Amino acid sequence: MVTQYLDDNWFSLFRHTMEKGRELDMNVWIYDENSYPSGFAGGHVNEAMPESYDEGVALKYLRAGVLPDTVDRFFCCLRREGDAFTDITAEAASRRGEKGDYYLFYKAYNPTSPWYSGFSYVDLMHEGVADKFIELTLDGYKKVVGEEFGGTVPGWFTDEPQIVVTDRESIRWTPDLFDAFRARWGYDLEPNLVSLWEEVGPWRQ
């Protein structure tokens, strides 16, 4: 983009557009992003809030018959016995080499891309991301538009903000998922993770 998104020149050009709209009795609508999907503010959210994109957005797993030497790299480790699962994450590192039926979960990340200014798309479920997006985009426009909101500038529109997984083998994840699940349903999701993929355990719940 020739004009740096959301810099002083950007808003100066928007002010000129707004004034021309008023002069010609035309409405000027604000699009809340520089591409799509909305939510990353052309990379400004990523830059100001690295946790908005670098803590993972999905969970995947692999099965193992032996706990590998690299088990401490996995996010969550479950041991299966029949249809029951036990969360052994806290002790997994000390049990390297033990045989069993293990489900080893790891985080997956959205790929970086020039489309996202060299970052990846943000996690819209991450606490504070929506507030930071509004602060960096719409609050900036409000300083320029002022009393013209509702007049020459009727409002703004958004374009397909997304909560997506990285592929078909993953489920959506965000840092406070386990805490939010426990607060809402009264039990832990961790030992029941496999039920989100397979018809085992309390998968009907």
Task: Kindly give the residue locations of the regions a language model identified.
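Mature extracytoplasmic enzyme cores
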Residues: 4-205
